[in-house]
A protein has these predicted regions:
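Helix-termination/interfacial motifs at the ends of transmembrane alpha-helices
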Residues: 12-33, 142-217
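Alpha-helical transmembrane segments of polytopic integral membrane proteins
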Residues: 48-55, 61, 81, 165-168, ...
């Protein structure tokens, strides 16, 4: 039944070829009914939100990457010389680095529990828990807003499809209310259907691309934080072994 209706509608489009319809954005906007305009406005808001999240996450991840590249060798050198205070100071100077945030938590916890030259297993365990908590917090910070990209990518096509349905309905209403069945009778409804479908895809595709890209970045950051935590715990264990000798 739907195939027959669409075939009939396409046949009507080629009748009365003298009708002139503009397909520029302004003309199509004026041809839309308010329900379809509302759909386009919603998609525009979703697009703006997605772009804002993309820019925010791109800036945050780039800053984290750049500062971490400077932080890692500097803090490694300080710890090699046994200068924990200096290592903490270096970490605090690189506050946008995901590695610095995790390492700072571990070093501060280690320093707070070290009341003597001897390093106990409890101190190492407390430092490990601090590292795990910090890594979880940083992971949540890195992921902030990214899930909304997935939501936009999955729902925008359906929002556009809703506008398409409204456009088709408007097209048939135009046919029913017009004396002729030519292009002019259905142009407004068809333009609504085309615009909202295209807008939904236009919003969804970049959001899905960005979500996959940022998810890969977060996974990479998680691996780096896990490796840094393990290396720091190994450092504490080695330092504990040297203290017992």
């Amino acid at each position: 039944m739907l195939g027959v209706n669409l075939f009939t509608l396409s046949s009507w489009l080629f009748q009365e070829g003298e009708a002139t319809v503009g397909f520029d954005p302004v003309t199509m906007w004026h041809a839309m009914a308010w329900p379809a305009r509302t759909v386009v406005i919603v998609l525009f808001i979703m697009s703006c939100w997605s772009i804002g999240v993309m820019i925010d996450r791109w800036i945050a991840y780039n800053a984290a990457r750049k500062q971490s590249r400077l932080f890692a060798p500097a803090v490694a050198g300080a710890l090699k010389d046994g200068k924990i205070d200096e290592a903490i100071s270096i970490a605090e100077q690189n506050k946008r680095s995901h590695l610095a945030k995790v390492v700072t938590a571990g070093l501060q916890e280690f320093q707070a529990h070290q009341v003597s030259a001897e390093i106990s297993g409890e101190t190492i365990e407390a430092s490990k828990r601090a590292l795990e908590r910090a890594a979880a917090i940083v992971h949540a910070e890195l992921k902030r807003g990214v899930s909304s990209l997935a939501t936009t990518g999955s729902t925008a096509p359906f929002v556009g499809l809703f506008g398409t349905v409204l456009g088709i309905i408007n097209a048939f209403r135009g046919i029913a209310g017009a004396k002729s069945t030519g292009l002019a009778a259905v142009a407004g409804g068809i333009s609504e259907a085309l615009v909202t479908t295209a807008a939904g895809l236009f919003v969804a595709i970049p959001a899905v691309w960005a979500y996959n890209y940022f998810t890969g970045k977060i996974e990479s950051f998680d691996v780096e934080m896990d490796n840094s935590s393990s290396e720091l715990i190994d450092y504490f264990i080695k330092r504990s072994s040297r203290g017992k000798k």
